[in-house]
Amino acid sequence: MAPSDTPPSAEDLPSQGELALFAPPATAEDALVPASMVNAWIYCPRLAVLEWGRGEKARSVDLIAGLRAHQATESGPTPALPDPMVLREDQSLKTRRLSLSSERLGLTAELDLLDVEEGMVIPVEIKVGKRPSVDEGAYLPERAQVCAQALLLREAGYTCLEGALWFAESRERVTVDLTEALVTATLVATSDLRLTVASGRLPPPLDHSAKCPRCSLLPICLPDEIAWFRKGSIARTPPPPASPALPLYGQTPGARIGKKDYTLVIQVEGEADRSLALDEISEVVLAGPVSLTTPAIHELLRREIPVAWMSSGFWFLGSTGGQGPRSAAVRTAQYALAGDERRRQAFARDLVSAKIRNGRTLLRRNWRGAEAERQIALDRLARLAERATTAETTACLLGIEGEAAAVYFRAFPQLFTQAVTTLPAFAFERRNRRPPADPVNACLSLCYAVLTRTLSSALSIAGLDPWKGFYHTERPGRPALALDLIESFRPVLADSTVLMVLNNGEIGTNDFLYAGGGCALKPNARRGLIAAYERRLDQETTHPVFGYQLSMRRLIQVQARLLARFVSGDIPRYPHYCPR
């Protein structure tokens, strides 16, 4: 006799110490738990809540291999599974791709493969890798996933006495017996996941678990980084690498970008078409009159590759796709923090202090002027950074920030080589914008605009709202949170890039246009500056808090995720990036 798939009655339940609290049946308004998330919950509750409850996604090597293993089983059309009322006891067949749901069980599933043997239906779940050497033939998470599929088949009226797992690498099939214990474990996992997601609670990360290194959500979960705030040390080095994919910039007027198979095709009048694999693209940045076809937009949306739309002058206009998790949990916490004056002010104090300290570090490392002037500037910035940590009001912080900016930019010309300072075109007196009046300010403005776009994208992918900040005020067209996060990165990413291209002679005096009192880079110079910025993102740094090495590109992603963890309450404070 098949084990029961009904939650046990009160008389059947164990003692209070072992009490399993079952969620009520789902309604039409409730989300149903995918069978794969039953697997995830038993493997790691935090993984299941992040992926299903918070809508977080990430592609890993194992995930891609799993997709290929599934595709390998699809050799052609198969017959449809007959209705249970007409399925004969002597009927046998194989079929694929069946969707089942049950509000009573609170479950839903996409079944990979179904075997029908003499009227008995057997769900077959395909797994990449080899069969594990355990007595049950497979680990509990995988067996529970198959069990959930079997319960859905029973609920639909089919006879299902067992399930199966197919391990693609070792090419072995393992029978999953639907024991009473497995059914209960599956129902409890389903119920626990539904109740946890409904509560809005995010389970803590596993503690230095061997499960973490191969988890696709490791770069999102950040278990060791979060543990650092409890232990003061971190066990894993280095962090997961950033994706090898890079941004695609389109800025030639009249250029057209379309889709062909698994590539984007770039067409520019008078030039040969160029193709770029979609797997090699992390985001698309379009500046000015560059067109993107509808099929290309659809494919980018499916792959969750963001598209940033910029003006010809690289003012950020908006974005398509890449909006991060399909959940409002992190943003809800973000809006709550924005209304918490104490926490918001503490964040702002650390932010301004970090910005000043990073500017001071850039001056200290790149100074080419008189030593006496250097020490005066460094001492003033050190005092202002310290004052920022005790500022009581936003107005006071703004005053400190403004004073520090004046000291910093007054000293900025001392960072240029003599070859640059002797050129009148590169004379720099103060920071100006809208429009920038000289070549140095034009370079700074472009780098700041591109950096704002980079951070806006990273914040959105982390589940945050780039338009709602904690320090910068909200204005139309101004991504306040991106401008918050940019402060500590301005000196180390944008300003350092400008110094690099000017001091190395990559951009010269003939690379600028002057009109209406403003100054702008010519197209080739703009491409060169953006390329230098991207090279800077690929350079490695040591995280000042966690001690591991990572690229600046990966650092931005880590910092955006840490900010999401901070606003969600996972960590007590946000560790601003301040290189030693």
Curated annotation (Swiss-Prot):
UniProt-listed InterPro entries: Cas1, CRISPR-assoc_Cas1, CRISPR-assoc_Cas1_C, CRISPR-assoc_Cas1_N, CRISPR-assoc_prot_Cas4, Dna2/Cas4_DUF83, PDDEXK-like_dom_sf
UniProt keywords, alphabetically: 4Fe-4S, Antiviral defense, DNA-binding, Endonuclease, Exonuclease, Hydrolase, Iron, Iron-sulfur, Magnesium, Manganese, Metal-binding, Nuclease
Keyword Calcium: no
Keyword Nuclease in annotation: yes
EC number(s) on file: 3.1.-.-, 3.1.12.1
Catalytic reactions of this protein: exonucleolytic cleavage in the 5'- to 3'-direction to yield nucleoside 3'-phosphates
Region of interest (CRISPR-associated exonuclease Cas4), residue spans: 1-223
Textual note on the cofactor: Binds 1 [4Fe-4S] cluster per subunit.
Domain of life: Bacteria
Cofactor or coenzyme needed: [4Fe-4S] cluster; Mg(2+); Mn(2+)
Amino acids binding Mn(2+) 2: E401, H472, E487
Region listing for CRISPR-associated endonuclease Cas1, in residue ranges: 248-580
Family of the protein in this entry: In the N-terminal section; belongs to the CRISPR-associated exonuclease Cas4 family. In the C-terminal section; belongs to the CRISPR-associated endonuclease Cas1 family.
Name assigned to this protein: CRISPR-associated exonuclease Cas4/endonuclease Cas1 fusion
Organism: Rhodospirillum rubrum (strain ATCC 11170 / ATH 1.1.1 / DSM 467 / LMG 4362 / NCIMB 8255 / S1)
